[in-house]
Amino acid sequence: MNKDTAKSYTALISSMLIFGTLGIFRRYIPLSSAMLALFRGLLGSAFLLILVFVKGGKLQKLKSRTVFLLAVTGALMGFNWMLLFEAYNYTSVAVATMCYYMQPTIVILLSPFVFREKLTFKKLICAVAAIIGMVFVSGILNGNGIKTRDIKGILFGLGAAALYSAVVILNKKVVVKDVYEKSIIQLAAAAIILIPYLLLTEDITKTSLNGTAVCMVLLVGIVHTGIAYALYFGIMKNLKAQSIAVMSYIDPVFALLLSAVILHEGLTVYGAIGAILIIGSAFVSEIARN
């Protein structure tokens, strides 16, 4: 392994570890999910824009159709984050993370209709395994019933997964050479679309944060979004798609570990089996696709 490849792997792993801590940070930020999503998009896009100019780059003029599609995917990202943050609020980080990682399964099931791709036997088995895993993770089989809060959290998590699936599908229709420019537009759109939503649903004048919360928000916007996106997209040309797909599963595994160690939200035996089925099926389907 040469030095450049080693640096790329280090950047990729670092970005996955950063993404894996997002649920923990969300627990300590006393903002509504919509407000946090807005700040994430705003700070993340600002950071990447500054990074592009510092590196001597400039934004290219894009076709109006491309900008429109990027704005739509960005808007979907904004509401996707909002639902994911709500999932973290209502259920454990572990369960919310597993719900969110149903996204590859949703894409697999939609692929025959959207991309005219054949649903192979391997992909079908992966989808069925993930759905069974979701049943295990949900707590239905624990015998104690599911709390209303957990049901809401699961639904928010699955909703976030569905929106992210839409982002993945639409992204395939958008061709932009500069991944930073693509991310800047999407992150900015995510923030902009949430402004009218917040004005209609919240009294933002009553929002107040202490010093710790402000630092947490800055970390989510700059580190979890700006820096993590820069690390992730900065290595895409240097590593094989399959390598990136494999390493991307550091994120949910690390999130599960942190949930257990820091928040003491360990999965039940059924939950652990479900997590293995969901992550395993997503992993196999990604490897097959790449």
Write out the residue ranges for each language-model feature.
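Glycine-/small-residue-enriched transmembrane alpha-helix faces in small-molecule transporters
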Residues: M1-L38, L83, I146-K173, I192
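Specific alpha-helical transmembrane segments that line the substrate/conduction pathway
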Residues: M35-L38, L42-A46, F85-K118, A160, ...
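Residue-level signature of transmembrane alpha-helical cores of multipass secondary-active transporters
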Residues: Y9-L12, M16, L69-L70, G74, ...
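Hydrophobic transmembrane alpha-helices of multi-pass small-molecule transport proteins
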Residues: L48, V52, A71, L110, ...
